[in-house]
Amino acid sequence: MRVLVLVILTLFLSCNNSTKKLPILSYKIDASGAKNYYKINYEGFTNQLGEPFKMKAKNIYISNFFFTRCPSICPPMRTELISIAEEFLEDKNVMFISHTIDPKHDSIPILKAYSEATGIPDSKWQFIKASEEKTKLQAETYMTNFKPNEDGSDFYHSSFVALVDQEQYIRGFYNVLIKEEVARLKRDIQTLL
């Protein structure tokens, strides 16, 4: 009986511990089949204050791609991200990054106005931009992409956000338009804290 209790307890604890570990998803597989892990890099990005964006040690980041004129998925994504940011407002180690995919239109003043409309402090949520080429390369590091529609008035892009850990590795992807995915994101944020 004692052995059975120990076996059950061991199984429970090992299952419980394994669910707390999040995989590192930022890697590429080389020709030999080996995983090459990489960190997210923000060299060349500027925030809504016109300052170079730099990731801070000890912070985790919820990161997405958007554009300020987006008429489709960006407004509901923004609403959900505002709600999540409000929930973690007091935690200085949880930050938000939104990359514009329309750097020609989304100037620093436009990003600043967009940021102010969220009601979330600049110190919590950074809206960033870079050259079109740099933004496309950044999207690739996040394993996503975007492209303009036929007349160039809109972009096709994802409703997923990424969770980036304190070491600048991607630890998860979440569709913030799905309630269960938002709940999973919140749990995973807590796991990394």
Regions found by a protein language model. Give the residues of each.
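Sec-dependent signal peptide recognition
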Residues: M1-V7
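N-terminal "domain-start" segment that seeds a small globular fold
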Residues: K20-A57, P76-T79
